[in-house]
Regions:
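Amphipathic alpha-helical interface elements
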Residues: 1-144
């Protein structure tokens, strides 16, 4: 039996929800006058900006996870300096994006072994643990 990848998707959705809200709060604090232009849209490539415009997105919660991680990475120096974050958070954000891509773009008959699956869940957990949200622990407890 192979791992149920819908659990990974559920966790990735949690990351997207939390990261979007967190980015909005932190970026507004760093850029009180126009964070959307200077901190969000500036972080996206031309294709991503076109998608944002077509979708009518106006806050980080409305961006997909790869875009959120792009915004996070672009603003990392300011976030790190202003909020004195753990540097590991940067690596964890990149890893979560890679996990999302792996499961979203998985071939139909691709086999994901249990060890890799549990490692991916643990990586997402470590990233979400930064937010110290109680619902995360509840969701994760059902995976083990």
């Amino acid at each position: 039996m192979f791992p149920d990848t819908t659990r990974i998707q559920m966790l990735v959705d949690k990351v997207q929800d939390f990261l979007g809200g967190w980015l909005e709060q932190k970026l507004k604090a760093i850029h009180p006058n126009g964070y959307w232009q200077s901190a969000v849209l500036a972080a996206l490539d031309e294709r991503q900006r076109k998608i944002v415009k077509e979708d009518g997105s106006s806050c980080p919660q409305e961006l997909d996870l790869p875009m959120q991680v792009s915004v996070f990475r672009y603003n990392w120096p300011s976030l790190l300096e202003t909020f004195h974050l753990n540097r590991q958070l940067y690596n964890d954000a990149v890893a979560v994006k890679q996990i999302r891509n792996k499961y979203d773009h998985k071939k139909r008959n691709a086999v994901i072994d249990w060890e890799r699956y549990h490692h991916d869940i643990e990586t997402i957990y470590l990233f979400l643990n930064f937010y110290k949200e109680k619902p995360i622990k509840f969701v994760l407890s059902s995976f083990y």
